[in-house]
């Protein structure tokens, strides 16, 4: 294993330790704002990674790009509207990751534009030449520039890991966030049935996840979200072209 490979793994690990706490903190913060003041003494209103780390979920995120943290325990009895507030609390985690991914995508494009201009190319061409994370044209352009390589690597994986967290947790399978969001639209009877069998459903889901059967569909969704973020930030090259 080369030194560069070790550094890549180290960077990915640091990014995971940054992203997971934000996801769970967002759940706890949202729950508190909606009336669950028990979050004050449960120790989850913090960005300390150790308070939120789930070893299995972190390992899954590291190797597959999709994972989870230790779930925030919510006292739903304190909510004014159980189904609505549970859905909002659940949505807060994936939303925080999507916002981080958006910020990372913008910064990735800013860094790329700066180098593109410095190298003597037209910044306005960046959208056509580098329309996705890790395009061949981009790596050819930055070959040999160690500082830029590591900057783009960090920003790229910062965005992709956050997208992976959001996509995975939005799957409507208990006890993932997606199941709590969709319960808002389901009958109480059906929600009770899902709650009753959620552990069996989740164990089956984890087994399927680690067999790799979900790699392609989850990868497709991750790629779709990545492309969408690049699309809605396509204004960055124009701004950078005017500034530089």
Each language-model region and where it sits:
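Hydrophobic transmembrane alpha-helices and their immediate loop junctions
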Residues: 1-244
């Amino acid at each position: 294993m080369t030194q560069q490979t070790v550094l890549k793994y180290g960077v990915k690990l640091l990014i995971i330790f940054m992203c997971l706490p934000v996801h769970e903190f967002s759940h706890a913060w949202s729950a508190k704002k909606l009336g669950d003041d028990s979050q004050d003494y449960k120790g989850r209103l913090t960005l300390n990674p150790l308070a939120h780390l789930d070893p299995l979920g972190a390992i899954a995120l590291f190797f597959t790009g999709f994972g989870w943290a230790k779930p925030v325990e919510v006292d739903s009895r304190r909510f004014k509207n159980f189904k609505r507030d549970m859905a909002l609390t659940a949505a807060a985690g994936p939303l925080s990751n999507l916002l981080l991914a958006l910020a990372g995508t913008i910064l990735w494009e800013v860094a790329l534009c700066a180098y593109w201009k410095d190298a003597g190319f037209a910044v306005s061409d960046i959208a056509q030449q580098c329309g996705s994370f890790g395009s061949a044209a981009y790596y050819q352009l930055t070959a040999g520039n160690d500082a830029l390589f590591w900057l783009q690597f960090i920003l790229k994986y910062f965005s992709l890991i956050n997208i992976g967290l959001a996509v995975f947790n939005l799957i409507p399978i208990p006890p993932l966030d997606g199941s709590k969001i969709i319960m808002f639209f389901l009958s109480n009877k059906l929600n009770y049935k899902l709650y009753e069998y959620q552990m069996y459903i989740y164990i089956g889901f984890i087994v399927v996840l680690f067999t790799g059967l979900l790699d392609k569909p989850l990868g497709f969704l991750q790629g779709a979200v990545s492309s969408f973020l690049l699309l809605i930030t396509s204004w960055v090259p124009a701004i950078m072209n005017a500034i530089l």
